[in-house]
């Protein structure tokens, strides 16, 4: 028996002493305010106080807190409450997933240094990452914790800052995807491809499903509807559960549902992999004779977009100055702190799925098609989103949750690990961009030519939007009389590329502004 004080109250737990403190708090004690972002001590979302000092709860075995004092964001301590009110006053919680950790780090500092400098606040928050805010309002809230609330300068909304409608929930650490699930929910674990391109075959799934603690095994053969989804319906091409072959590392090919309280260990799952030739770069994918990822897309091209205005070739031939340039950008991970998470259950004949999402109506339509349900028999409840930045516009675990609840009649839940989230979700499109820009003798732009090749990965996602939007925006905010701009999205066996704040325009802007700078230097501006 492990005994300790939690927020001033005695707690007694019969747990393996190596159990993470985060698991003990969240799963055994139901204290969901402490968040799990990485399970590796990197993000600090799980920061709690242990004997008055901040620690990452994901790195602390529960056996090490025996006889000690643990304080979490649920603590009734007056100074913590005061700091929460300061966070609300300053609007310091944006997505909110890091807020409980920030509050604990802030309280730790304020108890040692009641009137800290900004530099001291920055140092105290060094172990807690925030992906959204830039830290300004968080720092201000801690520095101004004792500041009296400023009264409104006018009646109504005009002239005053309005409190966030969801602010209280965010400072309490409530309402995220991993925080709620019906009692007795099955826990889902995904079987994912360890290869960028591989054929696979299953062994004796029935024998595996008969193992103690396993409630069921599910593959593409169990999907009752159309095993395809996509953010843009005419381009839908991604299976909820892949049929051989898997087209990218991290693709889900099967699900295992475990009974509650069971260790969701998929070791020994009966599957055999046969690695196949992988097309990693767009150049490889467009090479003559390269195998197609999708039979209906020659040269592995998803789509091409273009904008043509005037006669750019002639204008550049006549231009006083011309600069050519080539640039490459890489995949970029969205790096939200909250991994994908959600739960599903039946309610009065309606399948209910609660998950972190940026697009609940799109989720409903895509998931209903996969599960063969009319839209009025499926409800999507969006939880708070602990960072999204475009990636959570795409469906992730919603069809998986729905499938298991439909097949078993039981509620279920699923929480991606950090590694799963980074492997299986969308990224910013890598780009290869070439072109030239010309101006007259006075430096006035006369023409632009641009060709962009964007690595859209194994499936379409938002690739069509990127390929069509880039040619429209590549000339930037500058008057350009003659433009020829083309972009194409190319399939590879890399991660799926999707929406990420700008739909390809930031990549094009890097190229464009660099060329403009070089052109300005040449002209002497």
Question: What is the predicted role of each segment?
Answer:
Residues 91, 160, 166-172, 300-342, ...:
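Glycine-rich loop/linker segments at domain edges
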Residues 142-143, 155, 172, 234-258, ...:
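Glycine-rich and small/hydrophobic secondary-structure elements
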Residues 1-157:
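Signature of N-terminal electron-transfer/Fe-S-associated modules in redox systems
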Residues 37-40, 119-126, 376-383, 409-419, ...:
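Beta-strand segments within the central parallel beta-sheet cores of soluble alpha/beta enzyme folds
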Residues 64, 76, 223, 357-360, ...:
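Acidic, glycine-rich active-site loops and adjacent beta-strand->loop/helix elements
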